[in-house]
Amino acid sequence: MFLKIKKIPKVNWSSDKPYNFKPKFSTFFFLCFGLTLFGLGEGLLIVSFTGASPWSVLAQGISLNVNLSIGTITLLISIAVLILWIPLGQKPGMGTIFNALIIAFMIDLCIKFVPTPSNYLNQLILAVISVMMVGRGGGIYLVSNLGAGPRDGLMIGLQKVTNLPVAAVRAFLEISVVSIGWYLGGTVGVGTLLFAFGIGPCVALGLFLVDKIFD
């Protein structure tokens, strides 16, 4: 059962170590493909106008209580999360860098070319699709083992410490983050809740499918 997955699978195109800046072509391809899906999903969530992601809600909530912009707060949160990697034994890699570049590019692409659906039902459907895409993309790029993004790295580190399933750890992180953000005044929408409660199972399913297909 995919909800019980407790580690990132290793397949024939997985890198032996995260700190690898000369990976096989197949490893690099799946890293970029996974991050492209991930970024597309993030962009579609924004375009759906059903609510921001949990970490954006946290940034908004903090921004309302301090004299800093949401963008600055987002950067500071990412730095804080990366610092938390140290006691968890997480290491950055090529994927950590490409995570920021590809996802940002895909979000901008979505906002520019994908129109917001005209009715709310279609907006919700788009939000559901976006969460599934982030999960699948996350599963693919994490299996490449070339380094995770800040939040995914925190998830992996906490999973190793707690030995809990990936889905449970990710759900705990997202729900905690959105709860704090909401308490601080951040705006929570249906899409936010779909992401918070759905991303853990979707990432676990993504990992499960990659393992089964390439095993």
Question: Residue spans of the language-model regions?
Answer:
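Core subunits and conserved enzymes of cellular information-processing
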Residues: F2-D215
